[in-house]
Amino acid sequence: MRSHYCGDVNKSHVGQEVTLVGWVNRSRDLGGVVFLDLRDREGLVQVVYDPDLPEVFAVASTLRAEFCVQVKGVVRARPDSQVNGQMKTGEIEVLGKALTIINAADPLPLSLDNYQNNSEEQRLKYRYLDLRRPEMAQRLMFRAKVTSAVRRFLDSNGFLDIETPILTKATPEGARDYLVPSRTYKGQFFALPQSPQLFKQLLMMSGFDRYYQIVKCFRDEDLRADRQPEFTQIDIETSFMTSEQVMAKTEEMMRGLFLEMLNVDLGEFPRMTYNEAMRRFGSDKPDLRNPLELVDIADLLKEVEFAVFSAPANDEEGRVAVLRIPGGAALSRKQIDDYTKFVGIYGAKGLAWMKINDLSLGLEGIQSPVLKFLNESIVNEIISRTGAQTGDIILFGADQATVVAESMGALRLKAGEDFSLLQGEWRPLWVVDFPMFEKINGNFHAVHHPFTAPRGVTAAELEANPANRVSDAYDMVLNGCELGGGSVRIHNQEMQSAVFRILGITDDEAKEKFGFLLEALRYGTPPHAGLAFGLDRIIMLMTGASSIRDVMAFPKTTTAACPLTNAPGFANPQQLAELGIAVVEKAVKTEG
């Protein structure tokens, strides 16, 4: 039905007859000549119909936005005065000779030109129309090229694309599972996989050595801007490779991807330990474009007569840290109060501050409600450590170390945006040496997942002192977003059983949930390691989209619903009866 895509017609085609198909982006009658902007996935081209062909002209005069049409015509160069530098095809136009309306279009329920006026509900309900917008089409085409580039790299490096089951068994991976009832086994359920973690480990035990999969994963969790109930991973696993080798290979892949797709050289990725990241930035995924850093000052405040500072300064689990904001002395009291409310979201009880109005005047040039509790030597040392200058403000976080890290880390990001401090476009890094476990309500939980290997200890040593052990894990971070995370896996039964015990998983529970894994570990399991990247997040960053919903063809809303299909929906009674399921409480369908 066509000879060329609309966006591919150029000056080399002048004089040629072309056949184009697509949608009417815009149609206008100017002085007896119809100008038609025809659109397909590759772009726009202008088609001109004049009255010399009355029958064709009559049809062209009836066209409205989003009619699906076929155009036949001759390519001609535009006069210099009419060249449109904003269009890829702006040097040419097509003189229409024939026109077929393939399908007319009713008036659209949403605007494709002024899409900012469309609600997200509208955009998702009429997603097939929203995806006609060039911006959306370009993102999905970009995504297709990224997945193709990833496959080429992994294929050329000996990785095998192997599918793993979608219907599987529930395993504790941090989020709720989506359950699928079994008709054959009444009262029993499959779970949709949160990741192919155990299957890819089993593939290493099977001897496949290098595996990858671009795979759908499912998590029934609370949604945020960068979360969806179903999402796509670039899943990778290797045998006989160390964590250093896995990081080197996947860094090579990511650097090549950015160079090919964006012509950006990311350079060599720096390394940073988890402890350093939390200390300096209050986050295990620091945005290195932001020059602001947290500075510890607890050692200066142990003896001050101000319990807000001295109590956490003398508490082993407490922390006092400050954040210097260049130019922040200009903040009004209301703006400081707004920052105080902001850190309160993260559990902080307040936000002390110190304005450096004039450094040359000593204490006289400093304004702060806590200045009366601090002597001159303490103030001078705080100024020295932070590098504060006249016109700056120093903000104080004093609380439990976890609260200080989270609240001041979030404030660092907000201040960086508010004061336009971000430097550079792309700042990648590896974060390494994560703790094996974290304590929540007195119980140990795996920081990554329960199959992550510790670094440099035996099973007995791990059980004897689990709190201070470091995992052989690594996260790739870019601009404050975790692109992917991975680890060396446990490859012997003794260590895996020890980790289960530390996590409070009884032997019976371990056998019931992971018996197949524990048995597999008895039969010559090779050392193995891997990593999984969030494809949606990578595309979001590379395209500058504000949400992963804008780089997925048919995403869910923030309430995990699909306005297009009205999913989830109620099952009919016969289906439920076959599954042995009775709905005991009336379900309320949430719009949104």
UniProtKB/Swiss-Prot annotation:
Binding residues for L-aspartate, per the UniProt record?
173, 219, 448, 489
Q: Supply the enzyme class, top level.
A: ligase
Is the keyword Protease assigned to this protein?
A: no
Q: Which GO terms describe its molecular function?
A: aspartate-tRNA ligase activity; ATP binding; nucleic acid binding
Keywords associated with the record: Aminoacyl-tRNA synthetase, ATP-binding, Cytoplasm, Ligase, Nucleotide-binding, Protein biosynthesis
Which residues does the annotated region (Aspartate) include? 197-200
For whether the record's keyword set contains ATP-binding, the answer is yes
Q: Which residues cross the membrane?
A: none
Its EC number is 6.1.1.12
Residues binding ATP are 219-221, 228, 482, 534-537
A GO CC term?
cytoplasm
InterPro entries attached to this UniProt entry: Aa-tRNA-synt_II, aa-tRNA-synth_II, aa-tRNA-synth_II/BPL/LPL, Asp-tRNA-ligase_1, Asp-tRNA-ligase_1_N, Asp/Asn-tRNA-synth_IIb, AspRS_core, GAD-like_sf
GO terms in the biological process aspect are: aspartyl-tRNA aminoacylation
Catalysed reaction per UniProt?
Answer: tRNA(Asp) + L-aspartate + ATP = L-aspartyl-tRNA(Asp) + AMP + diphosphate
Q: Where in the cell is it found?
A: Cytoplasm
NCBIfam families per UniProt: aspS_bact, PRK00476.1
What the protein does comes down to: Catalyzes the attachment of L-aspartate to tRNA(Asp) in a two-step reaction: L-aspartate is first activated by ATP to form Asp-AMP and then transferred to the acceptor end of tRNA(Asp).
The record's similarity note reads:
Belongs to the class-II aminoacyl-tRNA synthetase family. Type 1 subfamily.
Subunit structure and binding partners = Homodimer.
Protein's recorded name: Aspartate--tRNA ligase
The organism encoding this protein is: Shewanella putrefaciens (strain CN-32 / ATCC BAA-453)
- Recite the lineage of the species: Bacteria, Pseudomonadati, Pseudomonadota, Gammaproteobacteria, Alteromonadales
